[in-house]
Amino acid sequence: MVLVRHGETEWSRTGRHTGLTDIPLTENGRHQARMAGVVLGDREFGAVLTSPLSRARETAALAGHPEAVPDPDLVEWDYGGYEGLTTPGIIEALGHPWSVWTDGVIHGENTPGETVDAVRRRAAAVIGRVAPVLDRGEDVLIFAHAHYLRIFASVWLALPVAAERLYLGTGAVSALGHEHGTPVVVEWNVVAPR
């Protein structure tokens, strides 16, 4: 299972929580997407899926996979009232330490937000749907988002959400697999040399 985080956006560059807001790639993000295609090479996949958000779809296309099928379960974590804010800004407003991983999000004006468990359930649903492809010995390629893919990896590994410890840069390629029947991380946060 190969995972690609979308290329840089203005909000990812400035550390803003970018959940369901549809932010386009920057020029650097487009370059990162093309470089992800270099890392992927000419490898063949039994299924190619993407978040329906434009930053992931454009990354898929620029990485050489315009055929990627949008899957709504691949959207980023819904940050609710914290959408568009930075972690330092949230901490300053709250007046105490805060982590999206342990403290969660608040209801927003236009969206209720989402718990980490809700994101885990979405990730588990995707893993369940692609299992038949993997069982046939074919690879699956997924284009999505940083927090989502970190949670996805923790679900794959059957670990509690320790995803905050798995840094994932923009345009990075990662791979999950099995060793002796045990789910493992094969590669993490791989980018093409500049």
Residue ranges and their predicted role:
Residues M1, E138-A146:
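Generic beta-sheet signal
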Residues M1-T59, N110-A124:
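Loop-to-helix element that buttresses phosphate recognition and phosphoryl-transfer chemistry
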Residues G7, S51-L53, D73, F143-H147:
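Short, well-ordered beta-to-alpha junction loops that form the rim of enzyme active sites
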Residues R16-P24, L85-T87, I106, A162:
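Short glycine-enriched, charge-decorated loop/helix-capping segments at active-site entrances
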Residues M35-W98:
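Phosphate-coordination/substrate-recognition cap region in phosphate-metabolizing enzymes
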Residues Y79-G89, P132, R136-E138, S154-R194:
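Acidic, low-complexity terminal tails and accessory targeting/binding regions
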Residues H96-A118:
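Short glycine/proline- and acidic residue-enriched helix-loop micro-motifs
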Residues A146-R150, E179:
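GST superfamily/GST-like fold recognition
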